[in-house]
């Protein structure tokens, strides 16, 4: 199941401008007596799309030989989402479309000229982002992402979440659990 959840652009002004988060859900397949609630995931980044992450994770967990994998896969409603400004969430951040083209210098600058080239391109990228997306950029923080997660929890009518974060998603999970400790049932952090 896929859809959108409208959340405040600025949580200090909850009745002001709204943005739309792209959200997906793969419902639990176990009996209601074994249902464990919702499990939100984040692939990291920051800026990684999490909308389809669960379609990859669930089959991995269902493999034979994993002690608790099938139960984890089947007993939760798995919730994926594209963080604000990412992927299918709207508005989506768009800076310089050709920035990631094939015509760019090496990632590791080996000369002073390459350092200058990267600095010039980085400044141009940041300037273009600021001009085109300044209103959104000011609200693309980890705290905003954590508040978005709590909005997803509330919209689904759940008192708590279980969370599975990878890479930067581990930091996001820590921030969420700091802001909303009573809303965390279980927290799994993988890497970092």
Cite the ranges covered by each PLM segment.
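Gly/Pro-rich cap/lid or specificity-loop segments adjacent to the active site
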Residues: 1-192
């Amino acid at each position: 199941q896929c859809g959108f959840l409208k959340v405040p652009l600025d949580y200090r002004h909850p009745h002001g401008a709204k943005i739309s988060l792209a959200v997906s859900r793969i419902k639990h397949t176990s009996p209601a007596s074994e249902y464990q609630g919702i499990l939100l995931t984040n692939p990291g980044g920051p800026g990684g799309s999490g909308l389809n992450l669960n379609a990859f994770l669930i089959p991995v967990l269902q493999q034979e030989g994993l002690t608790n994998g099938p139960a984890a896969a089947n007993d939760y409603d798995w919730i994926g989402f594209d963080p604000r400004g990412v992927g299918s969430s709207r508005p989506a951040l768009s800076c310089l479309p050709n920035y990631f083209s094939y015509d760019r210098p090496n990632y590791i600058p080996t000369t002073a000229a390459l350092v200058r080239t990267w600095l010039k391109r980085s400044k141009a990228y940041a300037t273009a982002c600021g001009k085109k997306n300044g209103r959104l950029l000011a609200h693309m923080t980890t705290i905003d992402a954590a508040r978005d997660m709590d909005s997803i929890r509330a919209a689904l009518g759940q008192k708590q979440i279980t969370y599975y974060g990878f890479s930067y998603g581990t930091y996001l999970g820590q921030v969420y659990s700091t802001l909303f400790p009573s809303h965390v049932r279980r927290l799994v952090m993988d890497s970092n």
